[in-house]
Amino acid sequence: MEAPTPLLLLVLLTTITFFTTSVADDQTAMLALAKSFNPPPSDWSSTTDFCKWSGVRCTGGRVTTISLADKSLTGFIAPEISTLSELKSVSIQRNKLSGTIPSFAKLSSLQEIYMDENNFVGVETGAFAGLTSLQILSLSDNNNITTWSFPSELVDSTSLTTIYLDNTNIAGVLPDIFDSLASLQNLRLSYNNITGVLPPSLGKSSIQNLWINNQDLGMSGTIEVLSSMTSLSQAWLHKNHFFGPIPDLSKSENLFDLQLRDNDLTGIVPPTLLTLASLKNISLDNNKFQGPLPLFSPEVKVTIDHNVFCTTKAGQSCSPQVMTLLAVAGGLGYPSMLAESWQGDDACSGWAYVSCDSAGKNVVTLNLGKHGFTGFISPAIANLTSLKSLYLNGNDLTGVIPKELTFMTSLQLIDVSNNNLRGEIPKFPATVKFSYKPGNALLGTNGGDGSSPGTGGASGGPGGSSGGGGSKVGVIVGVIVAVLVFLAILGFVVYKFVMKRKYGRFNRTDPEKVGKILVSDAVSNGGSGNGGYANGHGANNFNALNSPSSGDNSDRFLLEGGSVTIPMEVLRQVTNNFSEDNILGRGGFGVVYAGELHDGTKTAVKRMECAAMGNKGMSEFQAEIAVLTKVRHRHLVALLGYCVNGNERLLVYEYMPQGNLGQHLFEWSELGYSPLTWKQRVSIALDVARGVEYLHSLAQQSFIHRDLKPSNILLGDDMRAKVADFGLVKNAPDGKYSVETRLAGTFGYLAPEYAATGRVTTKVDVYAFGVVLMEILTGRKALDDSLPDERSHLVTWFRRILINKENIPKALDQTLEADEETMESIYRVAELAGHCTAREPQQRPDMGHAVNVLGPLVEKWKPSCQEEEESFGIDVNMSLPQALQRWQNEGTSSSTMFHGDFSYSQTQSSIPPKASGFPNTFDSADGR
């Protein structure tokens, strides 16, 4: 026999060594696991072969299975379990184990993990990375786990069939990874703190059973993705904040159980759902479903109470007029605000935004303008044969203008301006006043003969060839218009000449000391009482300031193409030459002075520190101000104008008479205030949430405040709040998760990731909002050096308090008088504060969900009526006649818009209507 070669001996020796080492590693891991159990199973002894221990299976001396379910085990799971490289199945469910679930990363053979119903308090970061063979992950009912996020590393576990993570304290949004999990059939995530929308990738999955019900803060968005989930058998989405209609589920031929109760769903129950043969159980109660009461098959178990159906008899249709209006709402995605008002089977019985004839039978006006609606214009509007006026302006509508509208014989006015419509411009009869400008940049220019497409006026008749009489009328109208335009221009030139003469005669001011101020007319709303700059007078204030009879000549402004030029002395006069007595506050960006005009209107004038402005150029500064002056939100302090004088820059804001939230929380006794009631505190918190929500997600772009704190939350006479100090606002670029920036903000309110890396996302503001909530609850400052170290940092201390709910009453502001009902509200706010201050940004909710949590608490008290807030700005590129025309147009139409105080569940309800031409962005300020 030939002797083995040295190479063969080396390979054999290496193999034996590796096998021996692997077995030894398994022995070490199993002994560590035995020590971590208290006590271990009785036969788990170091003196016996671990492969013979109860619940352990081996193959070739390597551990492949650990099965210890229902053994009443205590202790924890040793991290050495991650070295069992041949492990295929772990079953340790229904025990009393605690500690952290260790990492199983890179155990490529692992197929099953069962750890349900234990007392684990955490999950190792990346615990499930690299588990390419994993089929089942079940951690249900471990609700002591510290808040964590859905493990996105599961994207590599393409063999997964089942994920059970219900009641495990998951927070944040779901990653959009489910199209990568082609084998996934069961996804159970109920009873967590998941927020955000259903990921679109669910539509490309093969999921059969989807349980995502009972999220603490509630998921939101539509459920449209269900229409693509053709493998669905069971879908539990109840107890969330989903909105919009039920999609077409006719392709889900195996769907037998659909739970949609307790959401904000709207619209008509689709007929395809009524005929779905597989359906056996459905819950629709406690939503806002509209239209006919659906008639399901007798075999289907249905709960459907507490909706807004037009009839009480199943299968009975609504009146034609109601069905038409619901079709119109359908084009807009069935907005919740319409569902709340459009109830019953008579559209003339108090439906909002609908006006009827004197007989109370036919709709003659439909006013859906200035609500930020999305969607398209439904051609069903043409079925409203008596309709005279249709307002759809100031929304975000897309698509085309239906040609059916041109055949409405009663129609006299249609306004679709300030939308994003496209396609051809329909040719309306000459009797119809048709407005489509400004906005609608993609809308065609082939309008009728009666108006220029550039003006968006009334269009002429089709073709414009109705006879010689029509042509003569057109010529006459054209001549009259030309004469009026000429006279307006002539008057403007004369006016400008006279004003320049007066300016030269009475204001011997060095041209270098003349500033420019851009003024916007901010109508005071319920949030600012009489403290707003406009003081409730609207355009009258503008006229008073510019009238020669308004007082001293130093108050006479020169209008030049929309800009208003004033001497620096005007601001000196209204602030008593920037007297120390007029100082309202100081900040890193300047000093704020109280100012009072001759008519008694109060303003706040911020004199910017030169050092704070840095090297910012004049053109950049003006570009920023041009944006800030054109937008409004009822919970953001309004910037009214600015003045530039050489290197000095001044900002003019509305005045907020009740100071800031910090004064009412921490200095109320010294300042002679009464302590805030719980009602006032929750209302203020909701106002702030709505303002910041608008910055983050409801404006055209996303903006980050970066310095949210009580001193930047200002209060009006009715104690409604507005967010101020936008000197630090950062634009969040589209498509980027975060922005690297120079550190700004205030210690105590800085999110951990921002303080550590300087990378900022909207979750930085969410963290600061959580700190403010804690201050509202406790009456304590975010940082208080007068307290012992363990209590000086509010977030750290309060999060310890939250571990035991019974400790919360002891931590509250002693001025609060809380009954049982109030305490329930306090617990909700305390819980929200904890979520907002989670250490990991992805575990924090967005501000929209803060609004949804706080809204129902405020709704109980019905706080001060939120009046309509119209906002008007003068664009720097707009001529005076154009500005005056805008004011006239707004004055004739705005009074009928935006009635009522809408439900907290509609984030759009926190957006006041804007003047036409204003972008959907944000307004900011640092004054009072």
UniProtKB/Swiss-Prot annotation:
Topology feature Cytoplasmic, residues: 494-928
Keywords assigned: ATP-binding, Disulfide bond, Glycoprotein, Kinase, Leucine-rich repeat, Membrane, Nucleotide-binding, Receptor, Repeat, Serine/threonine-protein kinase, Signal, Transferase, Transmembrane, Transmembrane helix
Record-annotated disulphide pairs: C51-C58, C310-C318, C348-C356
Classification via PROSITE patterns: PROTEIN_KINASE_ATP, PROTEIN_KINASE_DOM, PROTEIN_KINASE_ST
Annotated stretches, region: Disordered: 445-465, 898-928
Induction remarks: Initially up-regulated by exogenous auxin or brassinosteroid but down-regulated after a prolonged treatment. Down-regulated by abscisic acid, gibberellic acid or cytokinin.
EC top class, as a word: transferase
Phenotypic effect of disruption: No visible phenotype. Tmk2 and tmk4 double mutants, tmk3 and tmk4 double mutants and tmk2, tmk3 and tmk4 triple mutants have no visible phenotypes. Tmk1 and tmk4 double mutants, tmk1, tmk2 and tmk4 triple mutants and tmk1, tmk3 and tmk4 triple mutants have a severe reduction in organ size, a substantial delay in growth and development, and a decrease in fertility. Tmk1, tmk2, tmk3 and tmk4 quadruple mutants are embryo lethal.
GO molecular function, one term: protein serine kinase activity
Topological type in the membrane: Single-pass membrane protein
InterPro entries: Auxin_Ser/Thr_Kinase (IPR052422), Kinase-like_dom_sf (IPR011009), Leu-rich_rpt (IPR001611), Leu-rich_rpt_typical-subtyp (IPR003591), LRR_dom_sf (IPR032675), LRR_N_plant-typ (IPR013210), Prot_kinase_dom (IPR000719), Protein_kinase_ATP_BS (IPR017441)
EC assignment: 2.7.11.1
Keyword set includes Cell inner membrane: no
Catalyzed reactions per annotation: L-seryl-[protein] + ATP = O-phospho-L-seryl-[protein] + ADP + H(+); L-threonyl-[protein] + ATP = O-phospho-L-threonyl-[protein] + ADP + H(+)
Family from the record: Belongs to the protein kinase superfamily. Ser/Thr protein kinase family.
Domain comment (free text): The leucine-rich repeat (LRR) domain is disrupted by a non-LRR region, resulting in the formation of two LRR solenoid structures shaped like the Arabic number '7'. This is strikingly different from the horseshoe structures of the canonical LRR proteins.
Protein name according to UniProt: Receptor-like kinase TMK4
